[in-house]
């Protein structure tokens, strides 16, 4: 029996490959320092867990509306107004099984075979394959380290064709940690507005910004931006809720209705009791978010200081998320070879940049303890000296 062409063209995940090797080594008792984590190493705050437990004990375990419980959709609309300057009705908000699910729903609702979707690289690993799954074509726009790994408006414009249907933006960005300024986003919106192109704005890392960086929601920039933008966010990164699988999108009414219809025929509703936890996350004390950001900031600064002292590697200071993208091209290895050798020789797991569309780089996550960061960077430095 054959599988479908769409399934066959999906690329195996390099992130999962490295992760599985690292876990196998740990299972054998090997001391592996893992820098591959794409999730906070903190526990979900207690008041969120308590709300979900209370929902379970109260029997809130049945189906909910496919787009999410009304009170959560309303709370998200209120959050978007307060935090992001966005005016959405609850009916324009669709709750899903994670921000990843929301991204795919948005692409499926707006793109079709023959369409092109522009994606700046380095990119989050799943974007191109999501585009391929709906039969559209990803168009990759490389960015440069000297530009802080950010796509310029002219790069976007040069990549456009009559088939361009969507631009995917991720700020703060995984894997680069780049945060686009309002001026940079306004220039990009100006290009999209002239061609009536959707913008999928993945803002899952919005709460994790550092120094003087400010997160700006693209849809807040102008009415035209609002009309073109599908805003995606969730609870995984800000509230350490990766396993709860809850994300959401907010979009123009026609797109939101299409996504609701799609979701009703695929996954139906997100987990009922997880939604109650998410409601508590939005309504409750936000101190845990600030505490987590402060700890990440300390780790970020330590990691950057250590990396700056290693010859022949460079790293742009990330302004958001919890990753550092390290350029190792001067060391003479592909990113996959570098990651494989680093793991096998030094017991350090990193993600090769090839997974993100840039083979010059590797990604290090500081979503792990400072002790592991110190030990892992000692090994990383010793390994680089052997090349």
Where are these regions (language model features)?
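A glycine-/small-polar-enriched, mobile loop at the entrance of the PLP active site in fold-type I
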Residues: 36-39, 54-73
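PLP-dependent class I/II
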Residues: 3, 7-13, 18, 25-33, ...
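Conserved N-terminal alpha-helix of the aminotransferase class I/II PLP-enzyme fold
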Residues: 63-96
